[in-house]
């Protein structure tokens, strides 16, 4: 119980006070003793309340007294009065008075004195003894009081110490209490902080996951954005082409079946639908185009008239030279033409290349034999020579010698088309139309609608004779010429040995002129004349002819067709553009290789040029291919010139030569060769092959990526048989334009198709027909689509048909891809050699380097006709080349040709089959980063865990590219996350490239999957392979089984996890497990 503190004022002024601790035992006397001075007596304690004062008796208990006041205690003040209390002093006075009275009688006090109490009785007198006694008593009292004072002081000191102790204990208790409260508060705060920290950590983890997801999505969005942009560009281009077709500017370019495919993602489906609708509309325009073709035929007649006038002018200017040309052209094909190489043999003519190059006459001479027909046939070349035409570049002047044989069917038309179209600028619509009309009128085939594959003439076989074509055809040739005229770059055809021409009068024979035109088209690309005077100087209004090029009969069967000058670069579906080398078919045993590589120019590669409408053949990108056109020596053309002029060079092919090679669209990138029109040139000599090899030696090769199957090159240069990078444009959606002009169809329609295929196989124009035409087994008609996308194009057969060689002739139209290109036979550099045809002995023998003029092999000393005999074994399809679908799939997946992948995959027996290095199409698509192809292959059910020779799976490839998106796609398709390589035993997560962009995300994802496998999804994983238990503590399982992981590792095993399958438990190897089950191969149908 806490003692109460009583404040006592020692004086009236209330300035001097003391505090007295009050306990229940404290009396008023104790308070007075505590407060009065030592030795002081007669003091009492008085309480004052509201001005009234009352003395407190000594025996009064102060504690109880204070409690009685209760709340009013603060109003009461206690004073120490230094006098006795009135009650006690009255009692003492009474006693003293009695004593004084008694003393008065005894002692007489001299003066008035007061007693100590102040009750003096002056009359009392004390004796000495009394005084002494009093003094003694007082002394004793003083001593007693002093003793009491000392005792009180001691007690007071003790009480103060006790009070201090109590206060200290109280303060300490209070402090302890406060500390306890503070500790509790801090503990509560700590708990809250810990809870908040847990929330913060969780939010950090969530934020990290979200940021990773956001990064992945942003990467996906960027990819999709790029895909959409590319799709938009493609759609714009296609829509522009469609608009041009509607306006009539582009003849014969239109995708067939409305299928324009490309590396499109799901977002592009809508765009594809729109394109399909437009293609359908284009098909509906076929009838209109046919009418337009009739008009074009009329215009061709006008062109023929113009050609006549031009020929008359030329006769005046070069009368003697023209006569010589006529004589040479008709007399012997071998004699070099002193005059311009314009002379084309109308009849099938097999030309034996002369050893020497023919010098070009100073002025290009236009052979009279060509007359209007030849001029029409060379519409472009002739015009180039004409004063009206802008001078050709010398290089471009060279004309590809073409077969004079009756195979003009394609070559003539195609040549003219190519000449016109190949020009760097697309031919004017009228020009295209003219050629197209010619093709229609001559070929009798229904005019193809631009954009719609045009049916080839019923028989595209060799054009048997130079028999005059209908005047319409001549005019169409002239029209082509007119079309070509606009192209300033067109060079006069290089001098060719005149093929034996049927006597040609100045008056053009419509048929012959067309044939000549077809055969003699001036390749726009300059070719260096092998030997002899330079090509016509551009300085002349008329470009001089390039050095004479021996005109070899172009074998229609497989020989590549020279591109008609009219043809501009063909447009190929962007998706179908992939680099391909031209593979030459083996020449027939009988075949006499033409001495001159003039035809070689027919195949051209086009690089970097924008894809032109199918109506125009794309210039060949490879300059080196063009050189052969001259005197058979391969001489590189400048790519630019070649691109523009190659068509013309090809164009000059002799009408007899039935196959012209269209220039292919140039490849997407200089490092990738665009598909070369595959024209296995028939009857190709070893010398021609050697020249081609030399040209290809410096040619850009497709980049060797992991998937490419490349044949080793021998010392002689690339193995042309194996380089045959078959144009698969048709399958890939690429367009090969058919020649505008088709000579009247002959019985051998298949042969013409083959020629077209061969000649036009160079859809990309990679080879300028560097290879002399080699005899090749005719490709199946389907395989050999008419190369020209123009009148001669046929609707494309189904992809299966395209790929499979057919033994029976089909008047069947060669397959055309959506762009009206006939589907070329798919081939890739990966294919060692055409499956269907074994290389002939000549091909197998390393060809000797070509001299400027190649002498025909002795064996082929006798002239051979290019015309195919109806019953010839070569006529059958059995020997046609068929390309390995797997090689095509491997290359298409590497190059990003989504359309080709979609089409060819059904031809592949096992899309997961690897090449000799263990590379599968999925490896290629992953390494090249083609997400849409990867997704397609995975959805198709290819083996996502196929490993190459070093154990690299597609997941390793994706990780090495730091592609999180592909890694996620592969993991979700059943990729084995713990699969390791053989050489360095590293998983995909170890293959992430630390110095490359995207390393952190890719590494985090793969390591995260490794850590979460067997933990997330309640420990459920999926077996990716079948496994039979080898020990009693192991589990057997089958692919696709859902296994629950109970323990990822223990003291005994780290690579084996303890798992449960059904009611069994045991060890399972972790590298056979995946986070997702593998996608099952889907049913193989073409649906």
UniProtKB/Swiss-Prot annotation:
> What PROSITE patterns does the record tag this protein with?
ANK_REP_REGION, ANK_REPEAT, SH3
Q: Name one Pfam family in it.
A: Ank_2
Spell out the molecular function terms from Gene Ontology. Answer: p53 binding
Q: Where is the composition biased (Low complexity)?
A: 459-476, 610-625
User: GO BP, one example?
Assistant: intrinsic apoptotic signaling pathway by p53 class mediator
Chief location bin: cytoplasm
Residues recorded with modification Phosphoserine = 332, 335, 679, 708
Function of this protein? Regulator that plays a central role in regulation of apoptosis via its interaction with p53/TP53. Regulates TP53 by enhancing the DNA binding and transactivation function of TP53 on the promoters of proapoptotic genes in vivo.
**How the protein assembles, per its UniProt entry?**
Interacts with P53/TP53; the interaction promotes pro-apoptotic activity.
Family stated for the protein in its record: Belongs to the ASPP family.
Name this protein carries in UniProt: Apoptosis-stimulating of p53 protein 1
Q: Which organism is it from?
A: Mus musculus (Mouse)
